[in-house]
Amino acid sequence: MENVVIIDAVRTPMGRSKGGAFRQVRAEDLSAHLMREVLSRNPELNAAEIDDIYWGCVQQTLEQGFNIARNASLLAEIPHSVPAVTVNRLCGSSMQALHDGARAIMVGDAQVSLIGGVEHMGHVPMNHGVDFHPGMGRTVAKAAGMMGLTAEMLAKIHNISRQSQDEFAVRSHQRAYAATQADHFAKEIVATNGHDADGILKRFDFDEVIRPETNLAGLAALRPAFDPVNGTVTAGTSSALSDGASAMLIMSESRAKSLGLTPRARIRSMAVVGCDPSIMGYGPVPASQLALKRAGLKLEDIGLFELNEAFAAQSLACLKGLGLLESMDDKVNLNGGAIALGHPLGCSGARISTTLLNLMERRDVQFGLATMCIGLGQGIATIFERV
């Protein structure tokens, strides 16, 4: 079975969904921009040699509908002979795109895959047009479709206090801001056209969503967002709403060698699991455990972790379940996470994987694990090994 290696990994800046930098930029354009950029950065690869494009996107309607992967590839002027498919595993969509592209290479159905994902939550809100089947109420609690209430459930089950959630949110913003100031995101962010507050076209090369002024006093003043009577989860301890795209170029190790391209890492293992929809945020725990088992590794072998911060309560419950609370400041989300950067649903899986790869290189770490919770009760994880 072929080893699958990561050649390149990039993303757009994260734009604020409400009146932000990408308010006049379409999701297809964000995607096409990254596709073109990946190809221009790797001229050794002829675009016609891409076997397939896998692109994550959750709300596949309006500008994100009718197979946005293909629409974006056509906008990027990738040869018509290269196919493209849109992948939807909700929050884990672009990580699933990575898994699908990698698996095709592993079994010999492909040599090169371009993968990524996008979500423009300013143009297509998360709940746009959603109509749950009423019969689901027989087996699944209605609140399981309300992500904030699933976070409240985890907070209660795992005794996650309001104070610890607020502290985690402050940490996310502080770390993301520090990473920005130190240019630690520079290697992964591709400057992207947007509009400033006055509507003037400009190129953005920084994440617009980070709030460096976030502090415990300000967060403590916020009301619970989902359970107004007994809740502890607030807007400040939930992932920000943002717009963005991410992309990765992956190929077989043998193809990379023949093209003279230097791999950054290889995929050591992949895993997807299901869990109770009412505690969907706990999915990263069994997903990570399965990925470790498939990789033949132990938790202590992993030098760095990227956990998508859907909610502080959800993140802390997972870290507690994995036994990572004590090592969090040394190993987990060292550049902040979705509470500060936002969680453009279809983009996030490849985004956290890209951030993880850069951290692994900067800190000379051999193994890294990226994992995410998924709405309606799933978890997904990928273990990367530097080569």
From Swiss-Prot:
PROSITE patterns: THIOLASE_1, THIOLASE_2, THIOLASE_3. It catalyses: an acyl-CoA + acetyl-CoA = a 3-oxoacyl-CoA + CoA. It holds the Pfam family Thiolase_N. Pathway: Lipid metabolism; fatty acid beta-oxidation. It is an enzyme of class 2 (transferase). The keyword Aminoacyl-tRNA synthetase does not apply. It is found in: Cytoplasm. The active site is at C91 (acyl-thioester intermediate), H343 (proton acceptor), C373 (proton acceptor). GO terms for biological process: fatty acid beta-oxidation; phenylacetate catabolic process. GO terms for cellular component: cytoplasm. Keywords: Acyltransferase, Cytoplasm, Fatty acid metabolism, Lipid degradation, Lipid metabolism, Transferase. Belongs to the thiolase-like superfamily. Thiolase family. Heterotetramer of two alpha chains (FadB) and two beta chains (FadA). Catalyzes the final step of fatty acid oxidation in which acetyl-CoA is released and the CoA ester of a fatty acid two carbons shorter is formed. This is 3-ketoacyl-CoA thiolase. It comes from Yersinia enterocolitica serotype O:8 / biotype 1B (strain NCTC 13174 / 8081). The lineage of its organism: Bacteria, Pseudomonadati, Pseudomonadota, Gammaproteobacteria, Enterobacterales.
